[in-house]
């Protein structure tokens, strides 16, 4: 009679009393839990109920949001005294058992009892021995026989045996004993935590979490292949890494330990919100212009190291960049900013009348997107439309085309001093798109020319306002001397700074950028003097049938990496911008010439085979 009727009556009575007690406790505790990490107040989880039926159990949340699951060798949940997953308020809630109070809601609903076996997670259902499963005939309880007498001092096997004993001996006297024993146990604070000293695996996991808890947090804007080196390096350094990207399937999100935030990197208000939520210590991006204004805004809002907003605008808008460089007397080509076809036609005529060729590009894009050289017989309006297609705000740059060797300069600014780390020779497709198809370090230009290149690059950095962090400056060496093509206040792409600079100088530029973002001193000491090079595969337009020779390329002299960006079955164009390239080879050598030869020989072994009839 007690088991099937009076026990439920007592549950309802105590459930109502518990609910009355819960309301003022909730009013006091809920804000503290929420403002600890702005997560939910209640922890809701599926548990095994009577007869194995699952239900949702409620508790006050005592762990940080997104805390990993750590299990002991017996499969039970890790519950060490120094568990780094538990919040400060959570320790108090657990010690006083206040975290269990919301389960009075479960008692009133009817899927729990005041006293009964403590419920387990769903994955335990198949672990119960047949002779123990008898405890499933009883409703799980807020407290129970094992909880009252042993709390967390016994392992899962002993706990199940105690629960089985209770299920076969349910009675009013036993419940009264358990009730008062629970009160005594809670007041004495005995066995709040389980002794986990003998479980090495669980201890190791907890130690890792403690290290993460004390580690700095860096936010990396972008989680694509471009930002992957920074994500990997930051994780290797033991940092907490928050990766932000609008693509939920971004490759950087697949790295173990990354905190994933699916947000557009140019949505400044939302990114700032994410930065505050994770209490970041630094923010950066890698080889991408689009997030630079966001980096500047986040740095300003949180008082972090980074470029200022004015510098970010100058570094991401070619028109503003040209104006700043011109004002500072830095050598640049003749240029005009235009917003419509009438202004465009007028600008083209002016540059041609100066005896120069004309190149057209969007003011606010990168990666050779929208860039086009006007030939003598080409229709200028086609070039305008092509550039406008890639312009976000509609502004187009009409410039003098500069003949001459093209290089890029990789720098790191520390405390206002711009340090040139390497000069890179560049190979492009030429007219009309000028997409880069190869890079070699160090530059093979003469020493005097390289010194002049360094001088112009440093002047450009100062004109833009870069006082801390990396830059990638592209320069044409004209008959009149080096002139700026453009400058990015970030690391160069195409593996120049992530792979080639470390191979040729021993300087880890990604590590340097992470250090600077966190307010630490980077190591820019040159450790070696070698050559490095990257070469992109030759390709035709069409659907890729197969890519031959990859293994042969990997086994070639000096090859460090062979990568494919577009695979079998994908439709590709000729190389019209950086995103259209199929793949590349990276190699090194004792000299720049040797590295270039190694990369070229390996790249020639790769054949991108196009289906002659993709519908066949």
Task: Indicate where each model-derived feature is located.
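A hydrophobic, helix-centered structural microdomain
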Residues: 1-65, 172, 177-209
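Hydrophobic structural segments characteristic of membrane proteins
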Residues: 102-209
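ATP-binding N-terminal substructure of ATP-dependent carboxylate-amine bond-forming enzymes
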Residues: 208-311, 342, 539, 566-580, ...
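A conserved helix-loop-beta module that forms one wall/lid of the active-site cleft
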Residues: 300-370, 375
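Internal nucleotide-binding/catalytic subdomain
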Residues: 371-482, 491
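Glycine-rich active-site loop/lid that clamps phosphate-bearing ligands
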Residues: 537-571
